[in-house]
Amino acid sequence: ISPMRLRHLSITAAVLVLAACDGAQDDTVPPESAPSEAAPVADIAVAGPERRILAFGDSLFAGYGLEEEEGYPEQLEDALRQGGINARVIDAGVSGDTSAAGRQRLAFTLDAQDTKPDLVLLELGGNDMLRGIQPDQTRANFAAMLDELQERDIPVLLMGMRAPPNYGTEYQQRFDALYSELAREYGARLVPFWLESIFE
């Protein structure tokens, strides 16, 4: 993903993250509810208590192949701060991570934080799909991570993914459904397909 595309996504996500932090009623946050273009935003003075957001995911958060300041968490923090939000987005992305790998390191990552995050962006599953891992296994790993976050009373914004048609109808339907099913089960906020604007 190019830095310009990430900038577009980060401005869109800033709206979604604010909704998640503020605990709005609707648990599903469609990307189309945000600005459709990465138009320049006038800086607003940063105010209020710091909101710590943990971006936990794979290479899409780690920024594989990008300069550090071009990564998604960094762009998101910049977009939030330009909007006057005193946000700190902590990059906890690891390139190549599957949901199983994320499950193994989540508790350690949370324990390593100075203070409890105000929100976790949970973005995994793409590498499961690329490796043909069965959606039931991916779902079980997500459920374990959501259990961990629920026990720690940390709100979650689930960053949904979708499988392409060439994976077959059955796989596609099972994979795509797991995010919305988990969001309903755990009361998590959901972006149904957070990369949607990239593929429009």
Residue ranges, per PLM feature:
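Active-site-proximal substrate-binding core of FAD-dependent oxidoreductases
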Residues: 101
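Serine-esterase "nucleophile elbow" of acetyl-processing enzymes
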Residues: 31-95, 105-116
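Sec-dependent bacterial lipoprotein signal peptides
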Residues: 1-19
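Alpha-helical cap/lid subdomain in secreted, periplasmic
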Residues: 85, 104-200
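Bacterial signal peptide processing site
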Residues: 21-25
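Second-shell loop/turn segments in exported
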Residues: 60-67, 91-96, 127-133, 164-169
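Cys/His-rich zinc-coordinating "finger/knuckle" motifs
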Residues: 28
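Conserved Rossmann-like nucleotide-binding pocket used by diverse enzymes
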Residues: 17, 90, 157
